[in-house]
Amino acid sequence: MIARDHDRMQLQQDPTAHAVLLTLQGTARKLGTRRLSEVTIFTTHEPCAMCVGALVEAQVPALVFAMADERRGAAGTVIQLARESLLPHQISVISGVRESEARRLATESASV
C-alpha cells in the first residue's frame, strides 16, 4: 500500500476532497510522478465522474471497488467513464469485491 485516505469534504468544506482524489495526490507525492501507470486503486464506493476523470488523467490501469454508487457512479453504474473509448486512457474495473463487508462497515460508521 502506497497511500490511503478517506473523504474529507465535510471536514474541509471542500467539494473536491474525495478519498480517491486525496489518495491519488498522496500516491503521486510518494512516487514522485503524476503518471500512476503501475498503481491499482482500491476503494469502498464506486468513484464519481470527477474521481474517475482523475484516474484517467493519472493513467491508473485498474480500479477495484466494493459498492456501486446508484446516484453518482462513473465506473459503470450510472455512467461508464472508466472504459470510455473516446478518452485517452481506459481503466480496467472490478466491482463488488467484499461488498457485504463494505456495506456492513458503512452501516456501522453511519450509526456512530
Report residues per predicted region.
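A structural microfeature
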Residues: 2-3
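Short, well-ordered turn and helix-capping elements at secondary-structure junctions
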Residues: 7-9, 27-28
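A short, polar/charged loop-to-alpha-helix boundary motif
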Residues: 8-22
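Immediate flanking context of iron-sulfur cluster ligation sites
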Residues: 33-45
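Zinc-dependent deaminase
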Residues: 47-112
